[in-house]
Amino acid sequence: MENNNVISRNFDKPTIVTDDIKENCLLENTMIGGYGTAIIDRDFIQDMNKIAESIDTSNSNLIAIITDLQNKIYEYFYSKNGSSLSREKIYDEKAIVNEDGMVIGTKISDLKGMNVALCSEKSTSAYIILKNLYDNNKISRKPSLILSYLREEFSNDSNPHAFVTISKEDDLYPTKHLLYDIENPSMLEDDKKESFALVGVYALTDEEKEDIDNGYECTPTSLYEIISNYKEINAKRVYGSKDGKNNKKKKR
């Protein structure tokens, strides 16, 4: 298997992907708990492009588009009849080994319906779909795949995390970049104190987007708090730093 490129995780700065992801590109995951390298294989890319073709973009509502693609990504990776094995075990059993006996990684298409996909595979899926829609002029906002870090507010426990940022555009959400976290939904409460979950979409100012790109901490505001009367009730999420509170950005 020929490797065209590698999406590597950096310890001291985020990895930002804005170009097309090529067949057999390697996606590095954290090795904590046995998580290995994922292979972005042809079947997986074709599957994501098929999902992109099935997305209804006629009403130009980006939140509806993101909700639709998220539902389809979860249907792809999760199944009631899927495996009960651990992620580590499945990565081991499905591993691709080269002619020298070295493990290259595990095809993401082999994780279909296995109930073990995490943020890196799901965020890569979302990025490929959104990039397809953008390239075909079905959405006007350009996506980027980000490999960085995440922690909860008031916690120093920062872990590797993948998510998607979406460039700002003069549409329903003007002057705002967006951060889409497919792994973590937004828990919200309306003015009647009724709680519910929606896809995790956050608004970013220009400065916050710059912080994300440079690995500085950023605590974005839920988009729903800006465009509706909803209030986010889950713990605030802090993106973009590996060292938590000890890695605050310097004042400019």
Label the predicted regions.
Residues 1-27:
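Intrinsically disordered, low-complexity N-terminal segments that are enriched in acidic
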Residues 1-9, 33, 237-252:
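Non-Sec secretion/translocation targeting segments of pathogen effectors
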Residues 32-109:
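Secondary-structure boundary elements
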Residues 39-69, 133-142, 164-170, 236-248:
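Gram-negative host-targeted secretion-system effectors, predominantly Type III and Type IV
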Residues 49-52, 70, 209, 227, ...:
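Residue-level detector of alpha-helical secondary structure
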Residues 65-69, 112-130:
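Active-site nucleophilic cysteine motif
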Residues 121-217:
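Hydrophobic/aromatic-rich core segments of domains that either
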Residues 212-241:
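Low-complexity, Gly/Ser/Thr/Pro-rich intrinsically disordered linker/tail segments
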